[in-house]
């Protein structure tokens, strides 16, 4: 009777009892599981190293290979578009303006390096047909660049689909990190003035114990950064090299090929319209980085530290976060306006995704609490 009573309690506690029982019966061999785990870690390291090398290549390529340098002027520098005569539209057909060195990139080739060939060129081939098919022909009115907005939105959607797994994993790790932020701040405050090796070792042990208890993988918090930086470099090069984007005058006032900060400083009396561009893009960038932190703080109010030293450490951490937010917010000012447009649209995607994640986590917690209460009631009744 006691055995049956215990079995009923166990089954009542787990709302997914059938799935859990099936999983136990079909347990994978431990040695095979361990081997697969090592293989997966090795593959991830290879991918991260590959992305790091590609990112460094993208950053330094223009210094060693001048034929890959972009130029804001149409028909100057390296450009991606259609072969001359294919469309009959100067905004899409690659041709030199005879002002400076010119290099065309209409067909796939490795002569411009693996970064441009493997990443930038394929990305441009996604948006080029969209740009061309939704354009306003030269003889039928003014093109306000709405096709450019549409093309970047579609590219953003594809990027989000590709990186959604990494983003969600990083978000969940960040969420767990937020839940223990108070405890970590307490440990940092506890060993703030410690200089001996033993104290530093004890601090590391205590922190790792909290991470292990709450299933936090510190490395996972940096994974999104490893992916975000190469993506940014790809988009930056793509919008800088794609001829129709360089030719876009957004809403008839903002040239997407020029840098807002440079235009404002060079002649503010003529280029004052770029001030409004900056005032639109920069605040949106700040909000998109602040809102996820704000929602995480609201969700984890009970995880805050209570000691004075812990609060001081927490304030220091948040100060660093705000510095990073403002540093990243300056990027749209010092890069071409097309990059600023991408960051603006990307910020909207980030806010929407963060809100959906926030609602999902809140509802999941409420559901977990409801199940826990139900288990307590069932266990009391069985007792």
UniProtKB/Swiss-Prot annotation:
What residue ranges are annotated as transmembrane? 39-59, 112-132, 148-168, 219-239, 245-265, 272-292, 322-342, 343-363
Q: Which InterPro entries match?
A: YidC/ALB3/OXA1/COX18, YidC/Oxa/ALB_C, YidC_ALB_C
* A GO BP annotation: protein insertion into membrane
Q: Which gene encodes it?
A: yidC
The subcellular location is: Cell membrane
- What is the originating organism of this protein? Mycoplasmoides gallisepticum (strain R(low / passage 15 / clone 2))
The entry assigns this protein to a family as follows: Belongs to the OXA1/ALB3/YidC family. Type 1 subfamily.
**Protein's recorded name:** Membrane protein insertase YidC
Has keyword Chaperone?
A: yes
Annotated NCBIfam families? PRK02201.1-1, yidC_oxa1_cterm
Gene Ontology molecular functions: membrane insertase activity
The record describes the protein's role as:
Required for the insertion and/or proper folding and/or complex formation of integral membrane proteins into the membrane. Involved in integration of membrane proteins that insert both dependently and independently of the Sec translocase complex, as well as at least some lipoproteins. Aids folding of multispanning membrane proteins.
User: Looking at the UniProt record for this protein, which Gene Ontology cellular component terms does it annotate, in alphabetical order?
Assistant: plasma membrane
Q: Which Pfam families match?
A: 60KD_IMP
Record's subunit section = Interacts with the Sec translocase complex via SecD. Specifically interacts with transmembrane segments of nascent integral membrane proteins during membrane integration.
> Could you tell me the membrane topology recorded for this protein?
Multi-pass membrane protein
